[in-house]
Amino acid sequence: MTDLELSSEETITCAIIADTHIPDRVRELHPELVNKLISLQPRLIFHAGDISHPRVIAELEQFAPVYAVRGNRDWLFTKTLPLNRTFLLNNRRVFLTHGHLNFHQYWKDKMDNLLLGYNFERYSRRLLAFAPDANVLLFGHSHHAECRNQAGVFFMNPGSCSVAEKPDHQLSFGIIRFSPGGIVSGELVRLN
């Protein structure tokens, strides 16, 4: 089932946000994020989970329609948000997930990260197994920002726009563009 199908003669510009953790780790959306969303005027906002409180969605909806998924810390959304969503944007199949995928994968990931450290290849393999037909995979969870095209699939983890847990993490969000010709491009935007 597809949550949204959207085709346009113009490029569809979307913001992707993850791991806001409001109010369990920070009190509000980063003010620079708010200013950048005002300037960007995205057509859609994707939230890749760990929202923590429903007011975050309401605040983001001031800028564009929000499509969100439930993260491992989104207990308040158990009955209202799915774990995964799919979209068709300018003929590109998009899969949105938090990245923990399910209870079993969450604990496996915890152990792998503890013992082996973060590894993008591990995430990409698991995500592709859940969404083998996707052209675009959007995810969060690790707070590790990624923007790469690999084997014809565009991957983006916007990092966290609220919490930089490790020295190599910076606060960030993502911008992703879907051209009418089916070309997908994206960038990570650092927040100070």
Where are these regions (language model features)?
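Extended active-site neighborhood of metal-dependent phosphoesterases/phosphodiesterases
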Residues: 57-95
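Short acidic-hydrophobic surface loop/beta-edge motif
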Residues: 3-7, 83-91, 146-150
